[in-house]
Amino acid sequence: MTSRNEALFSRAQRSIPGGVNSPVRAFRSVGGTPRFIERAEGARVWDADGKAYIDYVGSWGPAIAGHSHPAIVEAVREAALRGLSFGAPTESEVEMAELLCALLPSIEMLRLVSSGTEATMSAIRLARGFTGRDDIIKFEGCYHGHADSLLVKAGSGLLTFGNPSSGGVPADFAHHTVVLDYNDLDQVETVFKARGDQIAAVIVEPVAGNMNLIKPRPGFLEGLRRLCTEYGAVLIFDEVMTGFRVGPQGVQGLYGITPDLTTLGKVIGGGMPVGAFGGRRDIMNCIAPLGPVYQAGTLSGSPVAVAAGLASLRLTQAPGFYDALAARARSLVDGLSGVAREAGVPFSADSIGGMFGIYFSPSVPASFAEVMASDREAFNRFFHAMLDAGHYFAPSAFEAGFVSAAHGEADIQATVAAARACLR
């Protein structure tokens, strides 16, 4: 008998390329039929067949308070009643900018956009306009959205589909993108010594989350800061995923590094489409209408998205919020690691704040090459066994996972118990 998930996927493929609107959702990496989600609440989602899952995807990061949090839903309802979009400034977007500037000391001015891709694309253009240089440095396996110049040896969906770069990206774009190994500061230093006067920016996920979770080695981020300062390049932290997810000031707060520009998304939209980029005042003053670097958007600063984002951020400001979130993630990775040891399965796991990574390898990877060496077939088997048991992990070995404030210890222990059965 055909399930509703299967029927919907078949139907979707007739009108949507691959049946999905973002490639990783297609389950191509793990095989099988994607789950079509009909509703979500707290730490759970329900698919088209009515099956419930404890959710560790969390809309790929935004659902930090859990799904359908009453405060966020009410904020969206109230904003929608006042009007969905105006194409004009609003007080709420000023409030959002002021809040983000207050929460992240590196941000002196900020511009709201409609997605993380828009944020990183605009930050790169701004860095080029500010410096008068063309070249950028990025790192293999780090994903910064689907802008052309950033789709060279990127992570996330490109890794899932086994492609180092996207088709349709002109060679000239790739020519201005220098791709180096994440966590290899010597490579960065060599490039700066050879062509430092041509480098406009270094863009990095300060904690990588799109080749699974990879933390920076000691001194790596500090070295990037030093080199960018020395050569006059703009240091861009892509905190679309990590911003307000790993701590109250993102990775930059945890590691004490001040970037020149920061890109944000996900949590700051509370589940609605939103992005932002901001940083030093002298750089941000180059953006139109103040300066020559153009950026615009019909729905930038959407009043409904901003309302959701403000509600989401206010929830994270509760005392002990991030300590509790980190404890939940640590409980999960410790539990999964323990049952894998019991089963004799090569496995490792790590977490930071409300993010976690699981790897079918004997040690936690520190580089793209080490991630690629993990046992992806073992991950695929684990994914499907856990899915069948009602636990929804990211459908790719190259994606980080997320816990929310709605995950209770009982949820975590239920997942660990299911993993014990699946790994036998």
From Swiss-Prot:
The principal location of this protein is cytoplasm
Could you state a single Gene Ontology molecular function term?
Answer: transaminase activity
Residues bearing N6-(pyridoxal phosphate)lysine? K266
EC numbers for this chain = 5.4.3.8
Tell me its cofactors. Answer: pyridoxal 5'-phosphate
User: One matching Pfam family, short form?
Assistant: Aminotran_3
**Catalytic activity as recorded in UniProt:** (S)-4-amino-5-oxopentanoate = 5-aminolevulinate
- Highest taxon of source: Bacteria
Q: Its annotated pathway?
A: Porphyrin-containing compound metabolism; protoporphyrin-IX biosynthesis; 5-aminolevulinate from L-glutamyl-tRNA(Glu): step 2/2
Location(s) in or outside the cell: Cytoplasm
- What keywords appear on the UniProt entry? Cytoplasm, Isomerase, Porphyrin biosynthesis, Pyridoxal phosphate
What do the Gene Ontology cellular component annotations say? cytoplasm
GO terms (BP aspect): protoporphyrinogen IX biosynthetic process
Q: InterPro entries of this UniProt entry?
A: 4pyrrol_synth_GluAld_NH2Trfase, Aminotrans_3, Aminotrans_3_PPA_site, PyrdxlP-dep_Trfase, PyrdxlP-dep_Trfase_major, PyrdxlP-dep_Trfase_small
SUPFAM superfamilies hit by this protein: PLP-dependent transferases
Q: How does it assemble?
A: Homodimer.
The UniProt family comment states: Belongs to the class-III pyridoxal-phosphate-dependent aminotransferase family. HemL subfamily.
- PANTHER family, alphabetically? GLUTAMATE-1-SEMIALDEHYDE 2,1-AMINOMUTASE, GLUTAMATE-1-SEMIALDEHYDE 2,1-AMINOMUTASE 1, CHLOROPLASTIC-RELATED
Q: What is this protein called?
A: Glutamate-1-semialdehyde 2,1-aminomutase
Please spell out the taxonomic lineage of the organism that makes this protein.
Bacteria, Pseudomonadati, Pseudomonadota, Betaproteobacteria, Rhodocyclales
Q: Which gene encodes it?
A: hemL
